[in-house]
From Swiss-Prot:
The gene is Slc39a11. Keywords: Cell membrane, Cytoplasm, Golgi apparatus, Ion transport, Membrane, Nucleus, Transmembrane, Transmembrane helix, Transport, Zinc, Zinc transport. Pfam families: Zip (PF02535). It comes from Rattus norvegicus. The keyword Transcription regulation does not apply. This is Zinc transporter ZIP11. It catalyses: Zn(2+)(in) = Zn(2+)(out); Cu(2+)(in) = Cu(2+)(out). It is found in: Cell membrane; Nucleus; Cytoplasm; Golgi apparatus. It is a multi-pass membrane protein. Belongs to the ZIP transporter (TC 2.A.5) family. GO terms for cellular component: cytoplasm; Golgi apparatus; membrane; nucleus; plasma membrane. GO terms for molecular function: copper ion transmembrane transporter activity; zinc ion transmembrane transporter activity. It comes from the Eukaryota.
Amino acid sequence: MLQGYSSVSQALLGTFFTWAMTAAGAALVFIFSSGQRRILDGSLGFAAGVMLAASYWSLLAPAVEMATSSGGFGAFAFFPVAVGFTLGAAFVYLADLLMPHLGAGEDPQTALALNLDPALVKKSDLKDPASLLFPERELSIRIDKRENGEVYQRKKLAATDFPEGAAPSGPVHGNSGQPGVSSWRRIALLILAITIHNIPEGLAVGVGFGAVEKTASATFESARNLAIGIGIQNFPEGLAVSLPLRGAGFSTWKAFWYGQLSGMVEPLAGVFGAFAVVLAEPVLPYALAFAAGAMVYVVMDDIIPEAQISGNGKLASWASILGFVVMMSLDVGLG
C-alpha cells in the first residue's frame, strides 16, 4: 500500500496485508486454548463493527457520489448502488445455498460456524477430529439455518439426541487420530466455504484501490484505510477458524495452516476487482456497492450470530461498537 504504484499493484499489496493479518490471527492458536471463547467472541464483535463502518465510508459513500456525479441517473442515483448492494448480498447467500450440493451436509452455515464446546466433546470423537466440523447432532448451542437458508433457530440438544427414527452415523476413523478420506473431503469443503466468504473482502480492497481518484471521496487514503480495516477484522477471523480446529483435536500446526488458508483467496479477488474497475469505469458504483453488500451480509449472517451464541452477547455488542468507532475514525480522521 505505497503511493505511486498502479491500482492493481496497490490491490495486490493491500490484499497480501489482509492475508497476513488472517495468518497472524490464526497463529494465536499457539497461545490461546480452545476454551477461551470470550476472547474469540469479543474479537468477532469488533470485526463486525469494523466491517460495517468500512462498508459505508470506504465503499457505499464513494459509490453514491460516483452515481450522483455521473449525471446519468438524475433523481435515481441510488439505483446502481441499490442494485450492486443487493447483488453482493445475493452472491454470498447463493454461495451458502450451493454448499450442501457440494456435500457439506444440510447446514449451509459455513463461514464461522465452528462452535465446539470442548467440555462436551467425547474422547472417542477425537479419533476423528474432522467429523466434528459437520456433526450429525448438536453438541452445544449454535446457529441452525432452516432448509431455505433464511431463518435462524437457536437450539441446544444433548449429545445423545437424534431425530426420531434416525440412527447416529459413525465417523470414518483414520489412524493415530488423523482424519480419514471422507473426513479430508469435509475439511476441504470447510476451507472452500470459508474461502467463498473471504472473496468479498478481497474484492472490496481491489475495488477500493481501483476507484482511487475517480471522485473526491475515492482517495488513496480511503482505500488504504479500507485495507487496514479489513486486515483488522481478518485477525479474529483467522482465530475463529484455527481455535475450534485445535479444540476438535487437530495439531496446533494443522489448525494454524487451515486458519491462514482461508485468507489466500483475497489477493486473487483483490486483483480481479482492481482490473475490473480499471477496465470498466462505468461499473464502479455497482462494484463498490456489490462489495459492500457482500460484506454486510457476511456480518449479519455469520459474524454477529456466531459471536452471540456462547453467552458473551453483551461483550460482542460493545466490541462491535468499538470496532465501528475505530474504523470510522480511521476513515474520517485519516482519510
